[in-house]
């Protein structure tokens, strides 16, 4: 079924609402129309279809905001956009809606007829289901393989054997493992290298919806749909978090100018000590989270300038709010600093290594892991060339494991970057998927997973 032209039809249940809007559009004292639907592709489509069905010819303006606080709404109305700036967004939404219809109705009919069963097919749901099915096949046909390793313990340190050619700490050859063990027994080892390096680790980037959904699934077992619903409440009802359906992990420079007000708004309860630390100094926007070029429709999910009252949030809302707030504060904190020590041993031509980190400055981990045990691994002092005579050897072994089944969190990640799951190599299709952000959008993935 390939219609020459798609017709818009008003849903019977909402006909009264449509007529009310249509009558307002047609009023003679209304000179222009302001589109104030959800600031996104689907919100644009809803408004444009209503206007098209109503036969509107009046000039259009667009209210485009990322939070629904009173301040944000007033600022939005003070800086209305020309609706022509969003024409391409409307056309993209139309193309998606029509392609969904064409693929859905034709492929579903074909599958149902061929297999004599009620089977549905969708532009996004079917490739997603294919990834799940392929992973299940991989698990079903997986055969574990045993592997072997060696550990050397001396001077209070446990070292792990490393193959000089492959760099792997295990071998699939039991005979090789036995041979190395016999050759090293009763021998001496020499400290080949002691390398100490000061390193830093930056906080993870701000949340987009996919990243937030993955964390919420991993930590709390929330489904993607559940996380989106909670986020919608925090955005629309409580007005304490910004627009949820975003695919960006960056802020624009104009939003970065409001960081202090946003930090002040969350200076309550468990966050007060962290916000006090941030507010004591100058808040400097960093390139790691401020980049105009990496924000399309909406910036990353962050707190709004509206002060939060934690007692008004439900238990689940508190959990999601806590994730966002701690990630937000973490990027404003200094990096985590530590000293990494790498020790390499040589014994009869074989190499063993040990590695440990000692924290120097916890930095952002004060926020993200306040109760974290990071005392570090402090090694006894060893010098290069030092001989270790009294050491013990231990053979280790294990079996390879099949790939894990998808969780909602890992499935979201796969939908975001499905190229590596493609069974047929297609450079053009791979490039398109990378440019468009994968299967579905941050706004639709939760529904697709829920449907499957």
How does the language model describe each region?
Residues 1-420, 424-428, 433-450:
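Toprim catalytic domain recognition across nucleic-acid enzymes
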């Amino acid at each position: 079924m390939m219609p020459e032209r798609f017709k818009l039809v008003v849903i019977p249940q909402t006909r009264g609402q449509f007529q009310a809007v249509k009558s307002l559009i047609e009023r003679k004292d209304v000179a222009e129309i302001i589109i104030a639907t959800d600031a996104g592709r689907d919100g644009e489509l809803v408004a444009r279809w209503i206007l098209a069905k109503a036969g509107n010819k009046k000039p259009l303006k667009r209210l485009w905001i990322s939070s629904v606080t009173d301040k944000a709404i007033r600022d939005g109305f003070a800086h209305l956009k020309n609706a022509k700036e969003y024409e391409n967004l409307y056309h993209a939404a139309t193309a998606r809606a029509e392609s969904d219809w064409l693929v859905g109705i034709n492929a579903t009919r074909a599958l149902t007829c061929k297999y004599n069963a009620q089977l549905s097919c969708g532009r996004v749901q079917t490739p997603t289901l294919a990834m799940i099915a392929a992973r299940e096949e991989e698990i079903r046909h997986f055969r574990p393989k045993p592997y072997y390793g060696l550990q050397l313990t001396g001077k209070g340190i446990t070292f792990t054997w490393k193959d000089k050619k492959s760099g792997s700490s295990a071998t699939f050859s039991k005979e090789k493992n036995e041979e190395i063990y016999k050759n090293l027994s009763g021998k001496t080892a020499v400290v080949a290298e002691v390398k100490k390096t000061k390193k830093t680790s930056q906080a993870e980037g701000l949340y987009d919806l996919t990243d937030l959904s993955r964390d919420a699934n991993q930590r709390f077992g929330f489904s993607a749909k559940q996380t989106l619903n909670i986020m919608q409440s925090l955005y629309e009802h409580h007005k304490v978090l910004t627009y949820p359906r975003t695919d960006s992990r960056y802020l624009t420079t104009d939003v970065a100018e409001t960081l202090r007000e946003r930090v002040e708004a969350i200076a309550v309860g468990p966050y007060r000590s962290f916000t006090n630390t941030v507010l004591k100094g100058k808040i400097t926007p960093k390139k790691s989270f401020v980049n105009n070029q990496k924000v399309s429709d909406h910036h990353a999910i962050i707190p709004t300038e509206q002060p939060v009252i934690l007692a008004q949030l439900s238990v689940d809302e508190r959990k999601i709010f806590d994730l966002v707030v701690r990630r937000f504060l973490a990027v404003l904190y200094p990096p985590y600093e530590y000293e990494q020590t790498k020790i390499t041993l040589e014994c009869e031509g074989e190499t063993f290594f040990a590695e440990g980190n000692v924290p120097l400055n916890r930095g952002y981990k004060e926020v993200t892991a306040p109760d974290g045990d990071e005392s570090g691994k402090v090694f006894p002092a060893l010098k290069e060339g030092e001989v270790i005579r009294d050491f013990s050897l231990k053979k280790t072994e294990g079996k390879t494991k099949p790939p894990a089944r998808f969780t909602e969190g890992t499935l979201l990640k796969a939908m975001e970057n499905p190229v590596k799951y493609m069974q047929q190599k297609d450079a053009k299709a791979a490039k398109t998927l990378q440019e468009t952000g994968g299967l579905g959008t941050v706004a639709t993935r939760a529904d697709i997973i829920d449907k499957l």
